[in-house]
């Protein structure tokens, strides 16, 4: 029986971690392997790292040279994997990413499991997950255990912890017309879809030993999509992998000048590029919406919304809507005069809530809601933290807001995906 392992490593702009990933393959105690480095048109620093290893004849390199405009057409890592699979001639297929390292005995231990259990078609191992800061220092870690036979492996196993027989690929291709489903709608869970395909033919057998370690950086793919809703929230500062900051408003991402750096410092949401790039780029905003402003020598306080200044008529309205004086930004008289007047922000006890300010959190019947563009949206606590919505919620009842519709909830996208696919997570 053969024992060759084909490893498919996908990479994009992580030179330091990529080097560690490649080194971890070279240091395997099982040396009958081939490595496909499938790079998605990374920067020069990353490609320089790759070229250092191409003298090893077991290593093959493919650069996608994908055009930026085409990045939104498919789930890129799934596309890269599909490009490599037809050329893999190992008895077993294994996967790796540029932020994960194999432990030295990883291949030998999995090949051994197949040898001892001829009925095994797919195996998975325990994984150590390490969260690191911007300096690469460990903040925390936890383990993904491998202590059960999985008939539904989707959303439960990281794809760097799996090895399966190559013979399964023909069965999958015959049944589904392809290997990994690289439809863009699966951009953040392509491995889960592929595991579901594998589970049509075999369970995943466990090896409850830590055989790989994955590193989650502040800008890592996993951290970036964690707790993201299906749609970006108006009034958010966001950034992709290029670190450029945008202000999101009405479905458009507006570049933010350095003038407003004090606003987005420590409150910018990192999001995956495919998620960000679906929104077109607009012009630079003179003044972002959803901020408090006043003139230096004038007591009137305004809330900017829809490009208009809404005067907060008194202290009662200011306090009821949970505004904070520390958030007031002083602007010049000329800048203030360029803003058209919007409806004033008022509040009177025992009345219906009328014309409330947008992007404010409410607590209605013990549930959190975000009021945005005239609609109350249910919102999860994870999403409020993700988007730095730290304002104390405004207490209200459905009777107080009966004139406003209830809109689409802002819930983590993974929750929506799992419900839609009806895939078990326990």
Curated annotation (Swiss-Prot):
InterPro entries: Glyco_trans_2-like, Glycosyltransf_2, Nucleotide-diphossugar_trans
Highest taxon in the source lineage: Bacteria
Gene3D superfamilies (alphabetical): Spore Coat Polysaccharide Biosynthesis Protein SpsA, Chain A (3.90.550.10)
Signal peptide positions on this chain: none
Pfam family, one: Glycos_transf_2
UniProt family annotation: To B.subtilis spore coat polysaccharide biosynthesis protein SpsA.
PANTHER family: GLYCOSYLTRANSFERASE, GLYCOSYLTRANSFERASE 2-LIKE DOMAIN-CONTAINING PROTEIN
Function: May be involved in maturation of the outermost layer of the spore.
UniProt name for this protein: Protein CgeD
Native source organism of the sequence: Bacillus subtilis (strain 168)
């Amino acid at each position: 029986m053969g024992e060759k392992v084909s490893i498919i490593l996908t990479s994009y702009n992580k030179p330091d971690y990529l080097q560690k990933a490649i080194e971890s393959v070279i240091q395997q105690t099982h040396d009958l392997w081939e490595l496909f480095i499938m790079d998605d048109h990374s920067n020069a620093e990353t490609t320089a790292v790759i070229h250092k290893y191409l003298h090893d004849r077991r290593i093959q390199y493919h650069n996608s040279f994908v055009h930026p405009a085409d990045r939104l057409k498919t789930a890129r890592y799934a596309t890269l994997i599909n490009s490599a699979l037809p050329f893999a001639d190992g008895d077993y297929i294994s996967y790796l990413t540029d932020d994960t390292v194999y432990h030295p005995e990883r291949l030998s231990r999995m090949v051994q499991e197949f040898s001892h259990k001829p009925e095994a078609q797919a195996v998975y191992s325990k994984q150590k997950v390490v969260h690191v800061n911007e300096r690469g220092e460990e903040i925390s870690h936890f383990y993904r255990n491998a202590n059960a036979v999985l008939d539904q492996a989707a959303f439960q196993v990281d794809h760097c912890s799996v090895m399966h027989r190559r013979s399964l690929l023909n069965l999958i291709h015959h049944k589904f017309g392809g290997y990994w489903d690289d439809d863009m709608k699966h951009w953040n869970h392509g491995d889960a879809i592929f595991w579901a395909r594998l589970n049509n033919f075999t369970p995943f057998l466990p090896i409850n030993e830590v055989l790989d370690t994955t590193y989650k950086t502040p800008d890592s793919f996993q951290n970036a999509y964690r707790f993201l809703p299906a749609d970006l929230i108006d009034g958010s500062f966001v950034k992709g992998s290029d670190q450029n900051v945008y202000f999101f408003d009405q479905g458009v991402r507006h570049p933010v000048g350095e003038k407003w750096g004090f606003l987005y410092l420590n409150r910018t949401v990192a999001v995956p590029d495919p998620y960000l790039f679906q929104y077109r780029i607009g012009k630079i905003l003179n003044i972002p919406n959803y901020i408090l402003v006043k003139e230096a020598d004038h007591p009137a306080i305004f809330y900017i919304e829809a490009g208009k200044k809404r005067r907060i008529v008194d202290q009662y309205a200011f306090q009821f809507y949970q505004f904070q004086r520390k958030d007031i930004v002083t602007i010049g008289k000329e800048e203030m005069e360029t803003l058209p007047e919007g409806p004033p922000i008022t509040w009177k006890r025992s009345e219906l809530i009328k014309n409330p300010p947008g992007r404010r959190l409410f607590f209605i019947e013990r549930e959190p809601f975000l009021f945005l563009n005239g609609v109350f949206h249910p919102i999860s606590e994870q999403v409020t933290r993700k988007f730095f919505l730290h304002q104390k919620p405004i207490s209200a009842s459905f009777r107080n807001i009966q004139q406003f519709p209830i809109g689409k909830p802002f819930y983590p996208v993974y929750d929506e995906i799992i419900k839609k696919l009806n895939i078990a997570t326990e």
